[in-house]
């Protein structure tokens, strides 16, 4: 036999030496039960690769990797991804730069992720851009961020993406409020991916504003107490779209940081050490691949 083609998942170690007559078990290639290598030693290096096609030519001892988009199952693709864009300041500090240099990547990187997600068939991205707690940062950093978010119109107005902003807009600078209104109006008819940007947003805030709205309607006779249920509460939340299937947080932290607290009840979480400015197509696909290997039960049992 002159060649052998393998379908394998991410390697558990970055480099393997395949010796003559060596058996490789599931510990090395997840999904491969046993692989017999009959010829001379070969070095396998696959750091950072996701599910790949490995072609071992046993005559030339040449090893080829080919990334394969078909590895993602279209039927198991998450419809809605929530994204916590963390690690921008650390990215800048690691490079000896001012923190603002890290923040500058937020809007272009978000646009890149939307473009990739659209091609993959993802319908909604909800991105956590500025929390209700971020006001505690220095005035200089807050002012920079809020001014930077005015770039959303230039970046997305002609992208085919529909943009919605959630959060307490009344506390934002008037110039940013006008930019938000213009962006939402300009893109509302777009049929592509729906990008929801959480700006001056917090899960506590969203739950409280929904509760106040329901109480006011009840006090004014617009609904009875018996009418209050989960579906009604969902309608009063600012997100107003299906709950996320997958939450991705970049930057290594493993918490939700007051993001979509109600909506994340049955969301699958994925945490990566990759800092947001470095988060790219392969990182997104790896997160989705991880998601597609999970068994979502929503509180039930299917043994």
UniProtKB/Swiss-Prot annotation:
Expressed in leaf trichomes and stem trichomes. Keywords: Chloroplast, Magnesium, Metal-binding, Plastid, Transferase, Transit peptide. Residues 1-54 form a transit peptide. It catalyses: isopentenyl diphosphate + dimethylallyl diphosphate = neryl diphosphate + diphosphate. It holds the Pfam family Prenyltransf. Gene3D superfamilies: Decaprenyl diphosphate synthase-like (3.40.1180.10). InterPro entries: UPP_synth-like, UPP_synth-like_CS, UPP_synth-like_sf. One of its GO terms (biological process) is polyprenol biosynthetic process. Its EC number is 2.5.1.28. CDD domains: Cis_IPPS. GO terms for molecular function: dimethylallylcistransferase activity; magnesium ion binding; prenyltransferase activity. It is found in: Plastid, Chloroplast. GO terms for cellular component: chloroplast; chloroplast stroma. The active site is at 86. Disulfide bonds: none annotated. Its cofactor is Mg(2+). Signal peptide: none annotated. Belongs to the UPP synthetase family. Uses dimethylallyl diphosphate and isopentenyl diphosphate to catalyze the cis-prenyl chain elongation and produce the 10 carbon product neryl diphosphate. This is Dimethylallylcistransferase CPT1, chloroplastic.
